[in-house]
Amino acid sequence: MDYLQQGLERFKQEHGSEVPPQRRQAGAPRPVPPPIVYTSTKTVELTDETMRTQRLITGFEGGAFVDAFKMLRTQVVKQCRQNGWNVLGVTSPTPHEGKTLTAVNLSLALAMDLAHTVLLVDADMHRPAVHQAFGMDSCPGLTEHLFDEVPLEQLLIHPGIGRFVFLPGGRVIANSAEALASPKMAVLVEELKHRYPARLLVFDLPPLLSRADVLGFVPHIDALLL
C-alpha cells in the first residue's frame, strides 16, 4: 500500500489537498455561492401580506400550493442538469390560465436553491404582467431596453427575495412577435446566458395559440414549459 500513499502525497504536492470536482463523491454537497449584494439593481422590499395576497410561495411557510412548485422545481433542475440547460420559457395555450403566476413562483422556487441565481424576464410584450405579481405598478423594462436602449442595470428589479431578479415587460407594443424574433433580442438572450454561469433564465412568454410570438422566440430557449 506504500505506493498508493506515495501517489496521494505526490498528488497533494502538485494539485493541493482539494479533490477535483469530477472526483467528488456523488453525495458530496455542492459549494454554496457567496451572497449577492445588489448595488446597481433596484431593490423593492415586499411585505408578507403582499406576498400572500399575490400568492407568491415566499409568503407561505408550506402547504400543497408551495409543495407543488417545489416538486416542479425538482423536475426542472433535474432536466437542466442532465441536459446542460439554463434558459426556460413558460407559456400556456390560451390567456388567463395562470402562466405568469407559474413563471413567477417557479422562478422563486428555483432561487431557493442556493446553487442558482434566477432572472425572470417578462417577455409577454403584448400583455406584461410580472410586475403585477409583485404588487407593482407598470414600469419600464424589456421594451425600453430593446427600443430605447435603456441599460439593463436601470431596469432590473430585486424584490428582496433571495437570489432572484426580474426584468419587467415595460410598455405594451403591437409588434411584439417581431421584437422577440429580432437580432437585438437574440443578442440580449446570449448576453444574459453567459454573464453569470450559475444563473437560470426564465421567460414569461405570451400564450402559444393566440399570438405568433412564441414560435419566433423558441430558438432562443432550451425548453418550454406548457
Question: Where in the sequence are the language-model features?
Answer:
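P-loop NTP-binding module
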Residues: 1-226
